[in-house]
């Protein structure tokens, strides 16, 4: 059936997104200029922020780059902010963009080593409780130094690989489509497959939460951490130590939750790896190990050495994070024999869409700054006592981060806190405590929904999710015990431990106060 030009344009607009979503975005684009010119720029600015958060919350309907980008382009076009202000925001956060471009691509070339590690963990640890703890710890450690998306991508690769192997064997190799269970006609095999799915679901959730537990601890664990660290003038060690009063109790309690939900089979956890599946996977791994050539073994050794360089370079702050990532790309590709341009290009595919989206974030942040949108909220919070300010910043960040992207939320709040410090509203010591509250508030409660954690959203939209029956609702349900414990322990840490522990660490000489010159914080 022929369609009109108008219908063709509507079908092309935002692709396969639902019609109601397309109409909503078009409505935003029509209403925003009218409100800006005829009602109030302040109201129009807040409408833009809410609309942008809406596009982030609806990420499963349409990747936020397109609708959010259209809103940002219009905001610049009608004068909500200027191209110069947007360029300034991007320049201020160039380190973060380099982190995403080079570090994520660098870790892509270390995937063989990471796959090897997680495969050995899964097959060699027979206790499900210990295995869950190992996955959580491994994900936390890796996410403290690497990109959380890459870590979760590796765990997804392991899980999809194992699922494919077992599915093909149990369907007698007759069913090449692993999404189709019709080739499995045995009831026992169906039950075993369901148990295997439950087993993989729980492991993926433990790994996902592990990325949050480790990611909050270091300045490279999450993109917003680097923005916060730069604003406060902290290096890698400073950031890690300053976060410890909150992150260490949360980390310990997070691991306890991991043990308890597995031991008592709560919230969908506790499923064991079926023995039949273990036999199939072990046989496959033994065959793969036997076929591994000396060249492939040397690649694993080289990648392990590069991993040590990565940790040392970050811990000792030998170079900017993005440049360390670039060095990983050069070393890994040189010594693993990857010299084809097409092969190099694949490494950048994962990070560039999010890098583009982050640039759109900065355009919206420019609007927030230009229109002073958060000034009333910040003034309200800063009227409270210093200790109450910390809890309020933590809670406001946590609430927004659980429904929106935590990079966006963290960027907005650290900019406002920095502005309050520069205008003499808060002291330097209080600003640094607020930076800790903002970082932990942005990272910890955001595990509540896939919208808050990029790693969770990546898992939900991956090829693995439908295979193991991991829906949005099930993900929220399985994350609930972690959400409650991490949020509450984090709040208690901010309220009762942060100030006395920071004072003790300062007196002990573990941390020093930076001085600020020309608007940039520089550590002593």
From Swiss-Prot:
It comes from the Bacteria. It catalyses: 2 Na(+)(in) + 3 H(+)(out) = 2 Na(+)(out) + 3 H(+)(in). Keywords: Antiport, Cell inner membrane, Cell membrane, Ion transport, Membrane, Sodium, Sodium transport, Transmembrane, Transmembrane helix, Transport. It is a multi-pass membrane protein. Pfam families: NhaB (PF06450). The chain crosses the membrane at residues 13-33, 98-118, 140-160, 239-259, 304-324, 325-345, 358-378, 448-468, 479-499. Signal peptide: none annotated. GO terms for molecular function: sodium:proton antiporter activity. Its main location: membrane. Belongs to the NhaB Na(+)/H(+) (TC 2.A.34) antiporter family. NCBIfam families: NhaB, PRK09547.1. HAMAP family: NhaB (MF_01599). Na(+)/H(+) antiporter that extrudes sodium in exchange for external protons. PANTHER family: NA(+)_H(+) ANTIPORTER NHAB, TRANSPORTER ARSB-RELATED. This is Na(+)/H(+) antiporter NhaB. It comes from Yersinia pseudotuberculosis serotype O:3 (strain YPIII). The lineage of its organism: Bacteria, Pseudomonadati, Pseudomonadota, Gammaproteobacteria, Enterobacterales.
